[in-house]
Amino acid sequence: MDFTEIRLSGKTRREHDLLGEMEIPAEYYFGVQTMRAVENFHISRVRLNFFPELIRALADVKQGAAMANRDLGLLDPAIADAIIRACEELRAGKLEEQFVVDMVQGGAGTSTNMNANEVIANRALELLGHEKGEYQFCHPNNLSLIHISEPTRP
């Protein structure tokens, strides 16, 4: 994988999913599920970050979900506010280089959804004063509490 626009310090964080653990470069806002998608789907070799309008649309969906979850009492207001701020940053064009999964992938957009969830959750963690990957404070799954990936990208 070559993400030359992201400078690497050599520092990593350890993340895990149901398939096991993986070292993630500390500079990446995406996490283990995005890394697995990048490794597994080399179909078009065109990454999500070539389509900033899609990233902005995903940010709109995620922001709306965070607001609804906050209003329904499903998401802590401080976490929701950090997610909302992270989504506003995405709509302003920040962190586009972090959307690295292939535009064509298996499934129903799950990799796209998780790439967005991980980037937004990790930025929200920073806004809350935590380190990327400290998911006990804001987990990527918090961004999909009342929606699933299929409606975001068939």
Question: In which residue ranges do the predicted regions lie?
Answer:
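Conserved, well-structured ligand/cofactor-binding cores
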Residues: M1-S149
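Short "domain-exit" segments at the C-terminal end of structured domains
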Residues: E150-P154
